[in-house]
Amino acid sequence: SFSSIRKRSTNSIIMHPEILSISLFWFVTAYTPGPNNVVASYSGFNFGIKRTIPHILGVTLGFTSLVIFLSIGLINFFKLFPVIQTIIKYLGTLFLIYLAYKIASSTISDETKKENPVKFIETFLFQYLNPKGVSVAIIVVSNYVELGDNYINYATQIVILAFLFSSTSITLWTFIGKFLRKFATNDKFIKYFNYAMSVLLLLSIITFYI
């Protein structure tokens, strides 16, 4: 009937009742230091904004796709097999240790002659191995996406927020790295900056086990 169609139409524009708390949670988790943000600053510092775009896209599209898959049912897989999260944590740790080594061992000639070691496909796939990102996505989808009349509506809003916060936060951290480049008056500064980024990356691993 016309009334039922009108009702469905009205429901289709209902905002999630906890949209503000979700947004605050996304904001805090997205903008605080983490593996993706540290690598973004490193890349922005050493390679500039343009050559960091693959990393920005990899994080944004990778994390958003993770939230989409969780929203359409992958979340149940994690609930049935919680050991999967433990495996992800260890695999993510190994990848970050490897990346920290690459950053710390990079030389000035590497940065000027070679392309950015942070590739799109590596960054995209890492979103599925990033313990912080996976945990955050699972928490949000588990608590805020429920089956029902507004399932598609709410899930869509969650995905949009994931895209917005991941893209803006990773871009901001890239610009922070680019800005700090202005203070790089000699090769020693660049070397120490890369060491600092490598250490921050290793420190971010500790948070996975707290």
Residue spans of the language-model regions?
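Selective transmembrane alpha-helices of multi-pass membrane proteins
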Residues: K79-I108, S166-S169, W173-I176, R181-I210
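Alpha-helical transmembrane segments and their lipid-water interface positions
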Residues: N36, G58, G62-L74, L96-L99, ...
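Juxtamembrane transmembrane-helix termini in multi-pass membrane transport proteins
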Residues: H16-K79, V83, I139-I158
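Hydrophobic residues within alpha-helical transmembrane segments
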Residues: L24, I53, L57-L61, S65, ...
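Hydrophobic alpha-helical transmembrane segments in multi-pass integral membrane proteins
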Residues: F69-S71, L129-I139, L200-I210
